[in-house]
Amino acid sequence: MKHFWKMLTIVLNVVPNPVGRLLTLFRREPAVETSSYTTTEGETVPMRIYHPEKLKNVPALILYPGITPAAEEHEAINMLARATALAGVRTFLPRIPDMKKVLVREESIEHMINVYETVEMREDIDKERIACAGMSFGGSLFVKACLDERLKNRPASVISYGSYFDFKEALQFAITGRCSDGKKEYVFEPHNWGRIVFFHNYLEYLDNPCNPENVRAYLLDQVANDGENGDELYAAFPEEDKMLIDKIVSDQSKDVVEMVQQVMDKIENILLPLSPIQFLDEIDFPLYLMHGASDTMIPFTETVRFRRALEERGKEVHTFISTLYSHSEIEGYGKGPLGLILELWRMGRFIQDMLRPVL
């Protein structure tokens, strides 16, 4: 029963509803601390902590944000951190330097390990009850981090939300909107951010003449400031940079798809080591995979394929595809009040199972 009430606390404080708003009148808000961790390279990096009412020897949850300039300040991640702290879990939101720069790099795996080691050494947490969740691109990167021998005392629960199985397939979806779960083909309107992530990361592999720093500055402004400085930046660029930006942001032509494919061929050896499809056989721990059915950044089919591949190898995996969520946002729910209640119940049961070690 204790697990049930804690699960209910999390769900009611994550999904907007009148009951959750009413409960805030009777609950003391978690204390929020700005702390830090040190990377292998010696850099001190900010880490936000949500503290529950109980101060000593409590379970812990590390939430690794995805690739976003908001990093540890991301609104949806902070909403989840607040909810889990209200349920009695000390919750950590680390900044991963490259991911804040909208870069998907091998170095981020090292920094995720640095975070885990920092949390594990704390005196105010139960070291046997640490759960970790990686969001978006950070999900599969953290799964790989768990293969490192420094995490031999693995998290009590390893969670990946809205992430990819095959990095190359996920990036191709960002351009074409086409995806497959291995049995059925789907076509969606891909989120613009996916295109920006692709080109921002791999500009130097394009054959087009351009100034990468100019184009990256423009793309980063699109995601960090909603393009607030875009017109000013664009006006100052030479013509070849403008032409490339136009292709990246809005061109859906066959030429762009071919341009992307040329880049893919060059970077395959970079993408493969970051893809679970490459290290499936090394995964020897239970995995919890969640995905939004309406996700247009990384399609839910990536999680379906990941689950199927693990099951075929006899590995333990638990999966939940939510019709309530897209990538990090809650979509309008069109199945009526009863449908919403049933979906929340399904979600709650999965969260209760997934976070059982720390609730």
Predicted segments with their positions:
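N-terminal cap/lid segment of alpha/beta-hydrolase-fold proteins
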Residues: W5-P59
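Short, surface-exposed "cap/lid" segments of acyl-processing enzymes
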Residues: P52-A85, L93-I96
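Short alpha-helix in the alpha/beta-hydrolase fold that links the catalytic acid
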Residues: I77, F285, P299-A309
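Alpha/beta-hydrolase active-site loop
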Residues: L103-K127, A131
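Gly/Ala-rich beta-loop-alpha elbow adjacent to hydrolase catalytic centers
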Residues: G134-F142, V158
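Alpha/beta-hydrolase-fold enzymes
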Residues: K144-E239
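C-terminal catalytic histidine-bearing segment of alpha/beta-hydrolase fold enzymes
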Residues: Q172, L233-P273, I277, V304-R308, ...
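Short beta-strand/loop motif that positions the catalytic acidic residue
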Residues: I283, L289-H291, D295
